[in-house]
């Protein structure tokens, strides 16, 4: 009987330890800003095999830039930018002032991760914790983060649309992506892609955990 109990405990303990460790990381990774009371977890969905083959390299450079928790966001960006099939998979050449498709695959991922990290840092410095500002800025450039910082500090489609309208001088082009067709009949302003957040987020499942929920799960796990 005692041996059976030991075996049961030995089986359950690693699982409980993993739960405690996971949620402990969530809490420790909280932003210092007390207004940000949620811990987002990003999981990828419907990513193609061509994109997933780049995951090890994305993980490597995400880790180097301190953004490992955003690996699935970066993979979703690759899905939108190139489907994982172009050489410059993250289309990050232009963030270096280079012509499009100037970088090799590894150079593209290295620069894409570095650029994303710089945008994330810039947004946090401006008091913004909305990941969608970072995502849209990856497409528009850092000027969009400045624009949002002066207009509520939270991304919205209307802000993305108005930013593109101003930058394009109001010039519209046909855009037949299903998301655009559903939203406005199939057009966008001729500057970047005002639907970029929607395009990326269709490949993400974003869950929010409140501090209270995380703590409750940890307390329950520790009972055992």
Where are these regions (language model features)?
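Non-catalytic cell-wall polysaccharide-engagement segments
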Residues: 2-51, 99-110, 114, 118-223
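Active-site histidine-acidic residue metal-binding/catalytic motifs
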Residues: 58
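Short, charged helix-capping/linker segments at alpha-helix termini
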Residues: 62-71, 126
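Residue-level detector of well-ordered alpha-helical segments, enriched
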Residues: 69-74, 88, 130, 134
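Glycine-rich, acidic and aromatic/proline-enriched surface loops and short helix-turn segments
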Residues: 76-85, 140-143, 223
């Amino acid at each position: 009987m005692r041996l059976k109990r030991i075996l049961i405990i030995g089986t359950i303990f690693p699982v409980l330890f993993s739960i405690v460790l996971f949620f402990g990381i969530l809490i420790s990774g909280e932003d210092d800003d007390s207004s940000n009371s949620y811990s987002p977890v990003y999981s990828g969905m419907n990513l193609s095999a061509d994109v997933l083959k780049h995951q090890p390299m994305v993980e490597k450079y995400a880790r180097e830039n301190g953004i490992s928790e955003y690996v699935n966001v970066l993979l979703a960006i690759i899905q939108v930018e190139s489907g994982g099939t172009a050489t410059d998979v993250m289309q990050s050449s232009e963030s270096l002032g280079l012509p499009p498709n100037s970088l090799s695959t590894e150079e593209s991922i290295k620069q894409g991760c570095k650029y994303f990290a710089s945008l994330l840092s810039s947004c946090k410095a401006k008091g913004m914790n909305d990941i969608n500002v970072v995502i849209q800025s990856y497409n528009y450039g850092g000027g969009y983060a400045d624009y949002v910082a002066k207009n509520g500090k939270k991304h919205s489609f209307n802000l993305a649309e108005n930013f593109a309208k101003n930058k394009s001088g109001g010039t519209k082009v046909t855009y037949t992506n299903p998301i655009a067709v559903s939203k406005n009949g199939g057009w966008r302003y001729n500057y970047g892609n005002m639907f970029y957040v929607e395009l990326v987020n269709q490949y993400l499942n974003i869950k929010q955990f409140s501090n209270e929920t995380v703590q409750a799960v940890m307390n329950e796990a520790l009972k055992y």
